Amino acid sequence: MLSLRTSISRIQPCLFIRASSYQTEATQPKFQDKIRIRIQGGDGGQGCSSFIKEKFRPYGPPDGGNGGDGGSVYVAVKPGSFNNLSHLSQIHKASNGTNGKGGNRHGSCGKSVILYVPPGTVIREISAVRSEQSLEWVQMPGKTKPPKLKKGQISFVSEATRHGKELLYYRASSMISGAAEYSLEECDTTPQILCYGGVGGLGNVHFLSENNRSPKFATKGLTGEQKLIELELKTICEIGLVGLPNAGKSTLLNCLTASKSKVGEYEFTTIYPKIGTIKTTMPDDHSSFQYRLADIPGIIKGASDGKGLGYDFLRHVERAKMLCLVIDINPKAKIPADQAFQLLWDELNKYEKNLINKVALVIANKADTAAEQDLLLLKAIVERTTKGVAVLPVSAKKQEGLEGLVRGMTQLLQQRLLV
């Protein structure tokens, strides 16, 4: 059997900060990492047409308040609360603003909606319904038809319309949509707007003029935006563990982070990404350093073309700072170690050429069952294919070589973070 240079008897798991896989697959809700949902901002409330009531005066000065703005739809990251997108419903609508009232009382704004998502979520706008916003009038109660115009009043009506449009444009200028794609990192905990609510209508006090001292009309509020958006989770982690099914990635993650990933002797035990956190102490200054480690579902030949689970989950390693290829070097492995490495290398290269530049370490797992020759064959093909990528033998099952592995991953990651 192969003797591990960095072998240790038993090591305690590194301090566990959080693993998104704390529950087993059997107890977790359905995993969703790509969904489409409809979002809609609330409509603005109507402006009010009213007057101050005074004795012997049918219409005092106008005092109609504005309608409240409709609520908007926001998105924000909530670290540690979600590990996928299954908690989001298909439709999210903000509340409408309430109507204005007499006495210059403005309507209240509608309640906004915040969509909380895990870090690593990308949001794309698929389509948007932006109806042409026109100025619609609201008459005083009991006056369903526009008042008949007398001679000389046409100029006033056109002036009021122009003034109303200017005011609404000024109030609605913030409704100009932003970027069509958002990429949310762990630091994006401040809500970002996705869909604006409509601004409230104008009360009749805005239409007081020399030509009309008793304006008996107000305006309706504008409608809120409507959008169809797509949310895609691309897991954020510093290091991604990539390997064929049954290479021992889940066992490795469990040992290093005290995660609770499911382990089995059949293919595709892991059916969605699991994340654990390694916390270690640097030997030079004894400072604390932590990073996230992701167990990516097993990749098979043709994964870059959509076969198996690979196509859906290869995107989860796109944002990783560094990749570690986990190779089973057990002589009884279904695919020999050298062929397994070449297969993984080819699939990563086909999916996105930049991914192979992230490969910094090859972990030769199950080294306690392998001979020296098996490790030498793997090292030979790695040296021919890569530029300076090291091969480190470990045994996750027996927890041998893990201390050296953590030390090596930490050093390599720090080097990449400094670039």
From Swiss-Prot:
Gene3D superfamilies: GTP1/OBG domain (2.70.210.12), P-loop containing nucleotide triphosphate hydrolases (3.40.50.300). GO terms for biological process: mitochondrial large ribosomal subunit assembly. The keyword Disulfide bond does not apply. One of its GO terms (cellular component) is mitochondrion. Pfam families: GTP1_OBG, MMR_HSR1. Keywords: GTP-binding, Mitochondrion, Nucleotide-binding, Transit peptide. GO terms for molecular function: GTP binding; GTPase activity; magnesium ion binding; ribosome binding. The keyword GTP-binding applies. Belongs to the TRAFAC class OBG-HflX-like GTPase superfamily. OBG GTPase family. This is Uncharacterized GTP-binding protein P8A3.11c, mitochondrial.
